[in-house]
């Protein structure tokens, strides 16, 4: 469950390390984002000489949350951290690698490129 001012780790090799949510997309009164939702983020920490600079405002998709996600079969899944993957204007990932597992819900949200790059889909 991600809201404005939430701090997230970056799960790709774009060069950003930490981002902060500044908007949850999908309606004017929408407050929370979960796995597969698109948010607008500001880069708070970045590696030197990377594709993404500190202070950059970008879109990102949430790939892991500490808040559990209910599945249709009655099971739940949750992760140890809140993580996102940075996106460009055409909704493709900025990085070329994804670190750590991602949730299966990304497949239904249409992020097949991220699912195929991820080492594990839970």
Swiss-Prot record:
A GO cellular component annotated for this chain's UniProt record is: cytosolic large ribosomal subunit
Which molecular function terms from Gene Ontology are attached?
large ribosomal subunit rRNA binding; structural constituent of ribosome
Report the domain of life of the source organism.
Answer: Bacteria
On whether RNA-binding is a keyword of this UniProt record, the answer is: yes
Q: Return the InterPro entries for the record.
A: Ribosomal_uL14 (IPR000218), Ribosomal_uL14_bac-type (IPR005745), Ribosomal_uL14_CS (IPR019972), Ribosomal_uL14_sf (IPR036853)
In its UniProt record, which GO terms are filed under biological process? translation
| Keyword Ribonucleoprotein applies | yes
Pfam families the UniProt entry points to: Ribosomal_L14
Keywords of the record: Ribonucleoprotein, Ribosomal protein, RNA-binding, rRNA-binding
What is the role of this chain? Binds to 23S rRNA. Forms part of two intersubunit bridges in the 70S ribosome.
* Family indicated by similarity: Belongs to the universal ribosomal protein uL14 family.
Assembly and partners? Part of the 50S ribosomal subunit. Forms a cluster with proteins L3 and L19. In the 70S ribosome, L14 and L19 interact and together make contacts with the 16S rRNA in bridges B5 and B8.
Identify this protein by name. Answer: Large ribosomal subunit protein uL14
Organism in which the protein naturally occurs: Maridesulfovibrio salexigens (strain ATCC 14822 / DSM 2638 / NCIMB 8403 / VKM B-1763) (Desulfovibrio salexigens)
Question: Which gene codes for it?
Answer: rplN
């Amino acid at each position: 469950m991600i809201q404005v001012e939430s701090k997230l780790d970056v799960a790709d090799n774009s060069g950003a390390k930490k981002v902060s949510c500044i908007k949850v997309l999908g309606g004017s009164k929408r407050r929370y984002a979960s796995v597969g939702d698109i948010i607008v983020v500001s880069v708070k920490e970045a590696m030197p000489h990377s594709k993404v600079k500190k202070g950059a405002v970008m879109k990102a998709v949430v790939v892991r949350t500490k808040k559990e996600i209910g599945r249709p079969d009655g099971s739940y899944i949750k992760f140890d951290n809140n993580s996102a993957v940075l996106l460009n204007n055409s909704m493709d990932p900025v990085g070329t690698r994804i670190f750590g597992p991602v949730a299966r819900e990304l497949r239904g949200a249409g992020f097949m490129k991220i699912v195929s790059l991820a080492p594990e889909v839970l």
